[in-house]
Amino acid sequence: MRLRRPLIAVAGLAAAALALTACASGTTDETTSASDSVAGTGFPITIEHAFGETVVESAPERVATWGWGSTEAAISVGVYPVAVAEQSWTVGEGNLLPWVEEAYDAAGVEHPVVINDDEGGATIPYEEFIEAAPDLIIAPYSGLTEEQYDTLSDIAPVVAYPEAPWTTPWDETISITATALGLEAEGDAVLDEIHGYLADEAAAHPEFEGKTFAGVWDGDGLVYVYTEADPRISILTELGLEVAPSVAELDTTDGGFFYELSYEQLDKLDADFIVNYSSSQEEAEAFLTKPETQAIPAVAAGKVAQVYDPVTVSSVSPPTALSFDWAGGMPALVTAIAGVLAE
């Protein structure tokens, strides 16, 4: 199923491209206001988050994004950021995610500045943000520290995550982004379409109902088990799947999005099947054949849905407003799960 993108289907939103095109050159003197072409409403808007609240006084003209998913969320409601976070693990330094690049090209929008992020948000190149001159920074799914938030706030208002880093549900990332842009109704329309897609997939796969799973990443010596709070896991529950009780029993007190299991503890991970995320096919195959991972009952039984290579993993970790129907991503994962459960 191909989702209908607002940037393709709604001519009025395509005009938003002109509003934010000045980004790539780093100039600001001839930028058209986003509010001239995208009907953002309800300003000033107050967004509450983990570090307090942020007031967006008026429709932003130069949006920057940080972290994951907010770039796509903005584009899905017709706003093309002037600066976006680098996704170096997925596509290398200075490049755009393929579905993001496709969106800019389809709309005829000059590509944004790609802000260096080769350390997964551990450090922030503030000078690059200053040069991009944003009037709003959107980062609802990120790892911002309070110190980073405070420093970025000296550059522009910052919308941070609502509770804990890297745990904001995929749909909240979309709704928070749309709300901050004064486009809440447009965000709701995007969510309605995606939820409809998920409902259709669930209806097409009644065998998913009630089946338990765990999502893992093999760290070679230990296995990372994603918590139910992690969006790549919670999204799968919308298909009728259930997070295995053995995952919750691992428990963590740090509010993180994964648990760590040593190879000696892998027998604790009991589920109907495993979703294994890997950076390459070789790593994925090794996960199936290691003597240590055979302690996981589902692995020993061959009940493993594989997701590998950086682009594919990123497209579902978690899916974004633009990557839901990326051919090798969510549709392929659903097919893989169906295949595992049919065996």
Regions found by a protein language model. Give the residues of each.
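Proline-aspartate-enriched helix->loop->beta-strand connector
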Residues: 129, 133-139, 157, 266, ...
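Bacterial lipoprotein signal-peptidase II cleavage site
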Residues: 5-8, 20-41
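A short, structured surface patch at a secondary-structure boundary
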Residues: 71-126
